[in-house]
């Protein structure tokens, strides 16, 4: 349900309702069965590459700390505070979802000779390391924010070839339920697309 930007009373009411549905950090929803689960999508539309794919890439397991390394959907009700939605969760640990959807994004872009995860039968030229810094709904201002630090490492040398921090913020029409997840998915899609395009110019 969308909250109009000019309706400040309705917007405040929506925020207050959403805050009532939050649980602190790592608390667990009690009763009523498991909450509905949500997934992330992989970007599909990319500009045509200017050269033929030449590198093979392994995307390592993404890393994160605290509640981000779980299936909880994070909300930031105020600066310095985090909570988790009580009425929703990711279909898997967020770190796993990010790795899988990042691989799919690279496959969709067709900018690598091959891309996979550790254990796949790929003779990798490079590894991509992803560290999730933020992946949350920000209550103040109603927005979704995703920040991921990416590093490209030479598979044989073990040296960092390049590194960059990617951030996307998009408006959210609500702080919980499908509208909040849609905003997070859009922000993630922007970051994932930027990572793919950046990596394809570096290697």
Model-derived segments and spans:
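Short secondary-structure boundary motifs at beta->alpha junctions and helix caps
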Residues: 81-89, 156-193, 197
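Generic C-terminal helix-cap and adjacent flexible tail
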Residues: 7-8, 197-203
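Extracytoplasmic/secreted envelope proteins and their assembly/folding machinery
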Residues: 95, 99, 103, 109, ...
């Amino acid at each position: 349900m969308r909250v109009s930007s000019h309706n400040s009373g309705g917007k405040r009411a929506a925020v207050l309702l959403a805050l009532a549905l939050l649980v602190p950090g790592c608390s667990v929803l009690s009763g009523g069965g498991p909450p509905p689960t949500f997934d992330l999508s992989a970007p599909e539309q990319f500009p045509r590459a200017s050269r033929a794919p030449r590198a093979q890439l392994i995307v390592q397991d993404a890393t994160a700390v605290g509640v981000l390394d779980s299936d909880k959907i994070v909300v930031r009700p105020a600066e310095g505070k985090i909570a988790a939605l009580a009425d929703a969760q990711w279909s898997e640990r967020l770190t796993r979802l990010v790795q899988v959807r990042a691989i799919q994004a690279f496959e969709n872009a067709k900018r690598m000779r091959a891309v996979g995860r550790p254990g796949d039968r790929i003779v990798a030229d490079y590894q991509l390391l992803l560290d999730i810094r933020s992946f949350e709904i920000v209550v103040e201002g109603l927005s979704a924010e995703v920040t991921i630090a990416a590093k490209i490492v030479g598979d044989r040398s073990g040296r960092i070839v390049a590194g960059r921090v990617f951030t996307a913020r998009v408006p959210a029409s609500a702080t919980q339920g499908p509208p909040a997840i849609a905003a997070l998915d859009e922000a993630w899609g922007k970051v994932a697309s930027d990572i793919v395009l950046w990596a394809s110019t570096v290697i």
